[in-house]
Regions:
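Conserved beta-strand segments of alpha/beta enzyme cores
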Residues: 53, 103, 119-121
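Accessory nucleic acid-recognition modules appended to NTPase machines
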Residues: 1-75
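Active-site-adjacent loop/helix micro-motif of nuclease/hydrolase catalytic cores
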Residues: 84-93
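Structural signal for conserved beta-strand scaffold positions within catalytic alpha/beta enzyme cores
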Residues: 9, 56, 79, 106, ...
Length: 133
């Protein structure tokens, strides 16, 4: 594991204001759109799961997990994607195996829920919060 901080701007409205982004169309075409989505998801999860202990995980080899939650005695991995149909990545496989995750949730802006593999499931932000709360 690598010990280094990762900076999130958890208030996406503040981020958008600082960058002069006033409309959704501006955001969609801006390079910060992925980071904005990631920060928004993390803020919503932490606000909805006050008993969770949150961490960021990254290895020397570059595998990373956007959010690692210790919740109700379980290790839950959260990977945040803006893609329409996220697929399994080597980082996800590493996280499931190395961290011995109970499960890994891939959060995306879509609404179709589906499995990617053993312990790995793609779902919407509202579904993930409802399941973990």
């Amino acid at each position: 594991m690598v010990k280094s901080p990762k900076v999130y701007i958890r208030d996406s409205g503040l981020l958008h204001t600082l960058l002069g982004i006033g409309e959704r169309e501006q955001l969609e075409g801006h390079p910060v759109v992925g980071g904005s989505w990631e920060g928004f998801v993390i803020e919503q999860m932490l606000a909805s799961l006050p008993n969770a202990s949150p961490f960021f995980w990254r290895t020397q080899a570059g595998a990373e997990l956007d959010l690692l939650l210790f919740l109700k005695g379980r290790r839950i991995g959260i990977e945040i994607k803006r893609a329409d149909a996220p697929t399994m990545t080597p980082s996800m496989v590493s996280a499931v195996n190395d961290l011995e995750l109970h499960r890994l949730l891939v959060i995306y802006p879509g609404s179709t829920r589906y499995r990617l593999g053993h312990k790995v499931e793609v779902m919407s932000l509202p579904e993930s919060i409802a399941e973990l709360a």
